[in-house]
Regions:
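Glycine-rich beta-strand-turn "strand-cap" elements at beta-sheet edges
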Residues: 2, 39-51, 76-101
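Short hydrophobic/aromatic beta-strand micro-patches
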Residues: 9, 41, 53-55
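An amphipathic, aromatic/His-enriched active-site/gating alpha helix that lines ligand/cofactor pockets
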Residues: 24-36, 55-90
Length: 101
């Protein structure tokens, strides 16, 4: 499993429009066979900033399969016009740690 964190800054004053657009666009993520889960969070200190956390089955499931799909083009068309700048997107792996105590 791969965790993707996308930091998104939307155009100031467009937060409600972005959240409404994401409510529509999330179906494209949910329908992807490579998507395991996702969550949209909004920054308290900077209300125009969001972090979108995804869990994908593999990195290629995200970067090749989802981003290369027609569904991604629809997703992008709904959300990207509301971005103040391109999102910062990074991928992570879980780190296995021994149990505490």
């Amino acid at each position: 499993m791969v965790i993707e964190l996308a930091t998104i800054t939307v155009i100031e004053g467009q937060e409600a429009a972005f959240e409404a657009a994401f409510a529509t666009a999330q179906r494209y993520i949910a329908e992807s066979p490579h998507s395991l889960s996702y969550a949209l969070t909004r920054c308290i200190e900077h209300p125009s900033r969001y972090v979108l956390r995804f869990e994908w089955d593999t990195l290629k499931g995200h970067t090749d399969a989802f981003r290369g799909s027609a569904a991604f083009q629809e997703y992008r068309a709904l959300l990207y016009p509301l971005y103040a700048a391109p999102p910062e997107v990074v991928h992570y792996n879980h780190v296995s740690l021994p149990a505490a105590g």
